[in-house]
From Swiss-Prot:
Binding site for glycine 1: 108, 174
GO annotation (BP), single: righting reflex
Cytoplasmic topological domain residue ranges: 290-294, 350-472
Domain of life of the organism encoding this protein: Eukaryota
Cleavable signal peptide: 1-22
Record's keyword terms, sorted: Cell membrane, Cell projection, Chloride, Chloride channel, Cytoplasm, Disease variant, Disulfide bond, Glycoprotein, Ion channel, Ion transport, Ligand-gated ion channel, Membrane, Phosphoprotein, Postsynaptic cell membrane, Receptor, Signal, Synapse, Transmembrane, Transmembrane helix, Transport
Protein name (database record): Glycine receptor subunit beta
Family per record: Belongs to the ligand-gated ion channel (TC 1.A.9) family. Glycine receptor (TC 1.A.9.3) subfamily. GLRB sub-subfamily.
Modified residues (Phosphothreonine): 391
């Protein structure tokens, strides 16, 4: 019994919730219908009769009660001339990767519709400002942007549409739009390039027999001073044209276009690309002044230069569209990369010369011959012998010193008898038995002392012999690399600037 009561209670609750939800939904629909605007031609006679006879609303109702927005003005007669002009609020920078640009504009269209002539009993100004909701009740040109990628209206806080109806039947519509337009770029001279971006306004359904777009005389595109991050755009560089197109099977369609000329500012790329890569190339030349046998310093310097330039090339390639032709910036980066790589190759050639046994032996022979020619050969050896017998003087002196100093001095008088000047510098409490006649400490168990240790000491390692050819390559590179790079700069900037 309890189970049945619980089930019935739950069923009642679910029915009540469903009914409340349906009522709320219907009320929302009702509210939407109340907000919906009906054109005078769609209103009933009773609704129209409620409007005061002398009011502006009544005049509009009289104009539109028999108005059919599906039929163009001058139907089966002369084509409708639509005068177009544009006011540019903002101009977004060109995106190289997607090849497009974004603008925010006021699009204004003006045409004459004889059916909308204000009656003679209308008392007021020559133009009647109408609520934007009435825009849908009128016939309007089917204008679209031929090179548009995306676009949107603005409706904050209300729909950004302005509608004027003039006494003679002229209609002026102004609307605010944000449009992304395609702009095919020619990046051959990038970043010293100048781009021409178009905005094409075309009729979608009406041929030239029914509709014609015409630029407003004088100044059809108003452009205030706009600062772009990478480009310069001037009002004098704006061009206007006619782009009427023929489509097979349908005919000719009216089209007008405006062309913006944008000149790129090179300052960003000078500071961000050209200056750093130039310094990296100059940095790679420092290896020419480093000793050829210092591979630990020269190799990392060359590798660092090449990797830095390669990284710069990769970074810029990711920011630019993948085009099949060579850009001006590509020429610069490739040249810098080649100069950096050439400095690394130059050191490889120097190393080959440095490690060539034949060249090393030839260099040793040349040095010996030069020393002999300078008098550092036989005469020097003769002067350094004892009485010319061939025994070196320092060896004879060492032998005599060892003979004289085999006995250990036992008193300071022994040191004085040998006339050594170091006696005064000896400490007072020194052990005479531990000093030889020279006043130097000796080992008790080794009578030879330090004289033998000096004889057994290894001679210092000989300095590496660097062939003249290796030095000559570095010498030539110091002048050749800067000269070639300077010559490349003269040619490069004379072509692309």
């Amino acid at each position: 019994m309890k189970f049945l009561l619980t089930t019935a209670f739950l069923i009642l609750i679910s029915l009540w919730v469903e009914e409340a939800y349906s009522k709320e939904k219907s009320s929302k629909k009702g509210k939407g219908k109340k907000k919906q605007y009906l054109c005078p031609s769609q209103q009933s006679a009773e609704d129209l009769a409620r409007v005061p006879a002398n009011s502006t609303s009544n005049i509009l109702n009289r104009l539109l009660v028999s108005y059919d927005p599906r039929i163009r003005p001058n139907f089966k007669g002369i084509p409708v001339d639509v005068v177009v002009n544009i006011f540019i609020n903002s101009f977004g920078s060109i995106q190289e990767t997607t090849m497009d640009y974004r603008v925010n504009i006021f699009l204004r269209q003006k045409w004459n519709d004889p059916r909308l002539k204000l009656p003679s009993d209308f008392r007021g100004s020559d133009a009647l400002t109408v609520d934007p909701t009435m825009y849908k009740c009128l016939w309007k040109p089917d204008l679209f942007f031929a090179n548009e990628k995306s676009a949107n209206f603005h409706d904050v806080t209300q729909e950004n549409i302005l509608l004027f109806i003039f006494r003679d039947g002229d209609v002026l519509v102004s609307m605010r739009l944000s449009i992304t337009l395609s702009c095919p770029l020619d990046l051959t001279l990038f970043p010293m390039d100048t781009q021409r971006c178009k905005m094409q306004l075309e009729s979608f359904g009406y041929t030239t027999d029914d509709l014609r777009f015409i630029w407003q005389s004088g100044d059809p595109v108003q452009l205030e001073k706009i600062a772009l991050p990478q480009f310069d755009i001037k009002k004098e560089d704006i061009e206007y044209g006619n782009c009427t197109k023929y489509y097979k099977g349908t005919g000719y369609y009216t089209c007008v276009e405006v062309i913006f000329t944008l000149r790129r500012q090179v300052g960003f790329y000078m500071m961000g690309v050209y200056a750093p890569t130039l310094l990296i190339v100059v940095l790679s030349w420092l290896s020419f002044w480093i000793n050829p046998d210092a591979s630990a310093a020269r190799v990392p310097l060359g590798i660092f230069s090449v990797l830095s330039l390669a990284s710069e090339c990769t970074t810029l390639a990711a920011e630019l569209p993948k085009v099949s032709y060579v850009k001006a910036l590509d020429v610069w980066l490739i040249a810098c990369l080649l100069f950096g790589f050439a400095s690394l190759v130059e050191y490889a050639v120097v190393q080959v010369m440095l490690n060539n046994p034949k060249r090393v032996e030839a260099e040793k022979a040349r040095i010996a011959k030069a020393e002999q020619a300078d008098g550092k050969g036989g005469n020097v050896a003769k002067k350094n012998t004892v009485n010319g017998t061939g025994t070196p003087v320092h060896i004879s002196t060492l032998q005599v010193g060892e003979t004289r100093c085999k006995k250990v001095c036992t008193s300071k008088s022994d040191l004085r008898s040998n006339d050594f000047s170091i006696v005064g510098s000896l400490p007072r409490d020194f052990e005479l038995s531990n000093y030889d006649c020279y006043g130097k400490p000796i080992e008790v168990n080794n009578g030879l002392g330090k004289s033998q240790a000096k004889n057994n000491k290894k001679p210092p390692p000989a300095k590496p012999v660097i062939p003249t050819a290796a030095k000559r390559i570095d010498l030539y590179a110091r002048a050749l690399f800067p000269f070639c790079f300077l010559f490349f700069n003269v040619i490069y900037w004379s072509i692309y600037l």
